[in-house]
Amino acid sequence: MATYGMANERLRALEEIEREIAAILLNAGNVILELSKEKPNERVLDKQATQFTASVQRVESELSGQIRYLTQVATGQPHEGSSYSARKDGTMALNRIDYARVKLAELSRTCDQMLEQP
C-alpha cells in the first residue's frame, strides 16, 4: 500500500508542476498584454518578470527532482526487462525541459527588448 501512497504523492507533485506551468503561461500573457499598451507600467512589468522567473525556477527544480527520482527508480531496481521505454521517456522529458528553457529565454529576451524601447 505504501507504493500507492508514494505514487499518488508523485502524481500530486506533477499536477502542481502543471499548475505552475499554467501560471507561467498566464504570467507571460500578462506581460505581453502590458507591453502592448501604449504606456506600459514598469512596476507591473517588474512584478510580472519576478513572478515569471521564480515560477520557472520552481518548475525547473521540481522537474529535475522528478527526473532524478525516475532515474534512481529505473536504475536501482533489479532487471525486469528492457529499460528502453524509461530511457526514452527520460530523454524526451529532458528534451522538453531544454525546449522550454529555449522558449523561456526567447520570451525573456523579447520582454527585455520591449522594456528597453523608449
Curated annotation (Swiss-Prot):
This protein's GO CC annotations: mediator complex
Keyword field contains Phosphoprotein: no
Subcellular localization: Nucleus
Single GO MF annotation: transcription coregulator activity
Record carries keyword Transmembrane helix: no
A Pfam family annotated for this UniProt entry: Med11
Alphabetized UniProt keyword annotations: Activator, Nucleus, Transcription, Transcription regulation
InterPro entries: Mediator_Med11 (IPR019404)
BP-aspect Gene Ontology terms: regulation of transcription by RNA polymerase II
Physiological role: Component of the Mediator complex, a coactivator involved in the regulated transcription of nearly all RNA polymerase II-dependent genes. Mediator functions as a bridge to convey information from gene-specific regulatory proteins to the basal RNA polymerase II transcription machinery. Mediator is recruited to promoters by direct interactions with regulatory proteins and serves as a scaffold for the assembly of a functional pre-initiation complex with RNA polymerase II and the general transcription factors.
Assigned protein family: Belongs to the Mediator complex subunit 11 family.
Entry-linked PANTHER family: MEDIATOR OF RNA POLYMERASE II TRANSCRIPTION SUBUNIT 11
Subunit structure and binding partners: Component of the Mediator complex.
Protein name per the record: Mediator of RNA polymerase II transcription subunit 11
Species this protein is from: Xenopus tropicalis
